[in-house]
Amino acid sequence: MKEADLITLRRQLHQIPELALQEKETHALLLKTIQGLPQTYFTIRTLPDLPTALLVKVQGRDPQRTIGYRTDIDALPVTEKTGLPFASKHSGIAHACGHDIHMTVALGILSYFAEHQPKDNLIFFFQPAEESKNGGKLAYDMGAFTGDWHIDEFYGLHDRPDLPAGTISTRLGTLFAGTTEINVDLIGKSGHAALPQNANDMIVAAASFISQIQTVVARNVGPTDSAVITFGLMRAGTIRNVIAGRAHLEGTLRGFTQQQIDFLQQRIRDIGQGIAASFNCQVKVALNQGGYYPVENNDKLTKNFIQVMKDDPDVTFVDTKPVMTGEDFGYLLNKIPGTMFWLGVNDPDSQLHAADFSPDEAALVPGVTAVVHFLEHRMLEKV
């Protein structure tokens, strides 16, 4: 695809953002675009139990392995405020995380290999439900990557607004944190504010729970490691002179390794049990990680990826640090070795998930070219 074709496609995708597992228009446009490419080496597959997902296998001419490339396709419940002439047509929904860029780059790569048969097999996975609903986990757990669709190594990108357009960046180890949703219900006994001895105040219990949780990162995580536990919502009480008999908390846990996350999850449960004993109340702790595992890049594959990018005269590569945001590609990389990387899109005055986020389309061609060059180089290497 030429740059003009990529830009046109990106703008079409940008105008039809859809939420997780509802990506019907997006799926239809992707399928139409893919069916418009030369089909000589293609097998196109849909998943009955995940109907907005799409897989495309490109048959290699002398396959020694199967390399996967994944892009997410869903959008966010955000009202777009970019002022672009091709802004979202769907009220209250926007591609505020740049998945339109992700899809366009993937289609550009696919279009190249439609005309230039790869040495190894390639499988492109157009994944629904990254922002929520665990689309990667759903696909893997239903056996999408078994049999003829087995993948030996997996790659994928995420756009990054604070890097110049077309810049590539990644690192060994963790790139994105793993995340866990925390929901806590504390159940005591309501009563008159003047008679606290006859009630069991869950505002006090909840405050103690939150305070104790803050010691977990400070005292159970090494000073050179990183983790975050944040509570962003608390609901309790109905009026000033009634002691609250119930409290509800919602928060998030983030860490850079699954071992660390497992440990922190258990500490939250332990503190919940302690609060229940201390305040003679019920504490129900629900932790939901779903598919949001840490995005842990495979050392061997990522060293190779970085070296290829550094050796490519057309690529600007920069080092990066891990980030505390989450990405459900982590679940797939927990099952299949691979690498995730950043693609700079040059919107430094905005950020991912912001209503005014507007990635630079100048990143499209460099993104496609860099990945094509990497895949061709990778396929020349011995298994």
UniProtKB/Swiss-Prot annotation:
Under the heading Pfam families, the entry gives:
M20_dimer, Peptidase_M20
MF terms from GO for this chain are:
N-acetyldiaminopimelate deacetylase activity
| EC number(s) reported in the record | 3.5.1.47
* Pathway stated in the Swiss-Prot or TrEMBL entry: Amino-acid biosynthesis; L-lysine biosynthesis via DAP pathway; LL-2,6-diaminopimelate from (S)-tetrahydrodipicolinate (acetylase route): step 3/3
Q: What is a biological process (GO) this protein takes part in?
A: diaminopimelate biosynthetic process
UniProt cross-references to InterPro entries, sorted A to Z: AcetylDAP_deacetylase, Amidohydrolase, Bact_exopeptidase_dim_dom, Peptidase_M20, Peptidase_M20_dimer
- Catalytic residues of the enzyme: 72, 131 (proton acceptor)
The main enzyme category here is: hydrolase
Which UniProt keywords are present, listed alphabetically?
Answer: Amino-acid biosynthesis, Diaminopimelate biosynthesis, Hydrolase, Lysine biosynthesis
Q: Which reaction does it catalyse?
A: N-acetyl-(2S,6S)-2,6-diaminopimelate + H2O = (2S,6S)-2,6-diaminopimelate + acetate
- What NCBIfam families does the record tag this protein with? amidohydrolases
Q: Which family is it part of? A: Belongs to the peptidase M20A family. N-acetyldiaminopimelate deacetylase subfamily.
As for what it does, the entry says: Catalyzes the conversion of N-acetyl-diaminopimelate to diaminopimelate and acetate.
Q: What is this protein called?
A: N-acetyldiaminopimelate deacetylase
